[in-house]
Design a protein with these regions (language model features):
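RNA pseudouridine synthases
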Residues: 1-266
């Protein structure tokens, strides 16, 4: 039958059994069958070390740093203490200062992160995020099929989200108990990506809230753009990477009060 309206499934895609719902009651039936353990974006230690060695630092002073996180690297250490932005900067600043993560990006997402070096700066930056004075822009690549939907070139998506308790880390649209999630978008135009120069549509995404997987769900859900981001293994189809990138970040430096603005291309 059809998937529940809270689920995001794309017609024609194969979705393996999941650990959350299926394995506890059907383990004996799943022997020899692919089980989705929701760790599809996991990167081995060797790859993570290589990613950490080419971490790009755009700005650094005694109070904060702005870095470009590559796709495949964690923002903070996982359960197996994998390499992360946090651990790399802790090592870099060892004996000088600590690293305080102000915000995070999914492992599969690339782009800009600001990291504080003192607890006071950390609190001040977090307050800016709470007051929504921090400006963020993401760039994503969508399949050409989005052009067939004849959507407005600019728009606003409001779909409340909550975690799926039986299928983590997936999020679901929950109009009863979900937290407000608001995204503005602007279609930019056609582009190419990857070694094969495949065609896609570039879109700018402006999150006005910061829910887990917000941009991914708002793109994929039928009541959003109904078009998953290319490479989104949770809500669409796998590819060489998730083509979602935090391209612009703007905030006020808590110490100098200077307005800081950073850009990095996808």
């Amino acid at each position: 039958g059809p998937s529940p309206k809270t689920e995001i499934r794309q017609h024609g895609n194969y979705y393996p059994a999941c650990n959350g719902k299926c394995k506890p009651i059907l383990e004996w039936m799943l022997e020899g069958i692919d089980v989705d353990d929701k760790d599809c974006n996991r990167t081995d230690n060797k790859t993570q070390l290589a990613l950490s060695e080419r971490l790009q630092i755009l700005y650094e002073d005694d109070y904060l740093a702005v870095v470009v996180k590559p796709s495949g690297l964690l923002s903070v250490p996982g359960k197996d203490n994998q390499a992360s932005i946090y651990s790399i900067l802790c090592e870099r600043w060892k004996g000088k200062s600590d690293a305080f993560m102000v915000h995070r990006l999914d492992m599969a997402t690339s782009g800009l992160l600001v990291v504080a070096r003192t607890s006071e700066v950390h609190k001040a930056l977090q307050a800016q995020f709470i007051r929504r004075t921090v400006k963020k822009k993401y760039v994503a690549l969508l399949p050409l099929s989005i052009l067939d939907k004849q959507l407005p070139t600019e728009g606003r998506i409001e779909l409340p989200l909550s975690p799926d308790p039986d299928d983590r880390p997936r999020q679901r649209v929950d109009r009863t108990n979900g937290k407000p999630a608001i995204t503005e978008y602007r279609l930019i135009g056609k582009t190419t990506y990857g070694e094969k120069a495949l065609e896609a549509v570039k879109i700018a995404l402006y999150p006005l809230t910061g829910r887990t997987h917000q941009l991914r769900v708002h793109c994929a859900h039928p009541d959003g753009l109904s078009t998953p981001i290319i490479g989104d293994n949770l809500y669409g189809q796998r590819a060489e990477r998730l083509w979602l990138h935090a391209a612009h970040l703007e905030f006020t430096h808590p110490i100098t009060q200077e307005r800081m603005s950073f850009d990095t291309p996808l």
